Amino acid sequence: MIKVNVFLLDVGSTFIKYMVYEPSLKAELFSDSVPFPMPLINDGVHYEISEEEIRKIIYRIFNTASEKECKSAFICAQMHGYLLRRHNTFGNYISWRDNRGDTSNYRLTNVDFSESGTAIKKNSPLASLCTYEESILAESEFFTLGSYISFLLTGKNITHKTDACASGFFNSCTLEKYDFFDNLVLPSVLDKVEMIGKYRGIDIYAPMGDHQISFLGSGAEKKNAYLLNIGTATQISTLA
């Protein structure tokens, strides 16, 4: 029997958890976790984390995946956070705990977000970006945490719809982009969990949103089923 080690990564808000799984044996061969970096800025409104610290951890973890001879990697990441890349330089990671968003901004007041898959709140990336100057956004590229990890590993700003739609920039049914900001570059979005590239011989699959994955893993398939997910933040949700 040929063993095919699969690497599973969950980038949470308190811990980053990872494991090596062997499907034919249905066995966990290795697992570990590291704390998610502490914020550089946490003043009650702004919550920013060093991009460099996140990058170092991701590369260190995937070096472990390579050492464990993993053939493929599946990733889920905390939703609603983002990074901006301007002039080839990344800014800090703006966490979902950040509350700088301008929900009353004129761009958002006449838009029906019912098909975006998210509600616009002060911690929403879309509302947060309304506080930036247009000239800055016109020179920037937007990344979810998931698409940022894709970029580190494959050079592509790409992610799965369960991660991308939490930003508020995409219609969750059609994946159509909402063009709120001129020239702001957005991630490419995949409808299916597909391989997007390789890192050190490992097939990297499009990252997914962690809350969406918790629902999938629960096995709840009926529309009248509710899921209580207790993590760093707690959510209660049902299928639409």
Predicted regions mapped to residue ranges:
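Catalytic phosphate/nucleotide-handling subdomain of diverse soluble enzymes
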Residues: G209-A240
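N-terminal glycine/serine-rich phosphate-binding loop of ATP-dependent small-molecule kinases
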Residues: M1-G91, I202-A206
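Short acidic-glycine loop/turn motifs at beta-strand connectors
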Residues: E22-L25, R85-T89, L153-K156, C173, ...
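Short beta-strand segments
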Residues: D10, F74-A77, T144-G146, P207-M208, ...
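Active-site phosphate-binding/coordination module
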Residues: S66-L126
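Residue-level marker for buried hydrophobic side chains located in beta-strands
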Residues: F7, S95, H160, P207, ...
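Short coil/turn connectors at secondary-structure junctions
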Residues: I2-V4, F90-G91, L137-S140, L184-L186, ...
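Gly/Ser/Thr-rich active-site cleft segment
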Residues: V11-S13, R85, F113-H211
